[in-house]
Amino acid sequence: MHASAQMKKAALEATRQELDALCARGVRMEGNAFSPIVLIKGELNDEERAGGALLGGADGTALRASCAAIGYAPEDFCALASVAGQGDDPALEAGKTLPTEVFREALEALDPEAVLLLDTAAADLMRETYADALVAIDDFATAMLKPGLVAHVLGRRVLALDGFEAALGDKREKQRMWAYIKQLGPAGAPY
């Protein structure tokens, strides 16, 4: 095996082990860990709280379609919960917000170029976790992750929404969410 291929294989294995360890501790993730976009959800629905797939319902279907429409490949879909699931880390209580250091560890392990915060709970945790980087943003509303504004945080584009799943039942709200999401197309996309 070529040295470069061996290095890639070793890096892939190290990433897999890091993500497996986070999941074993109680961090909930679904999808492609190498996706350029990560969708973060904090307000889980009944199915998700009962252990169902994260973004496995109508919200996930709509988000997959939205991501595809703005240029992401179908496999470019990764979801991260800002609340803990079942795990072996006694510091993580299922259903409770992840500690900031664990959330940061998970997001840095995924290392996306874009982050979509789907609800207020996700935005609150992002704001608390990355306060050190957000304070450097000149515009106060952007630094506070006001819904609809794209913030550049440690080389990532971050966009907060204020309740994507709840907006699905209201045509105007759904259109507003779509207008926001269109700002977060893939880096280098020609549109």
Please describe what each predicted stretch is.
Residues 1-191:
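A polyanion-binding, active-site-adjacent surface
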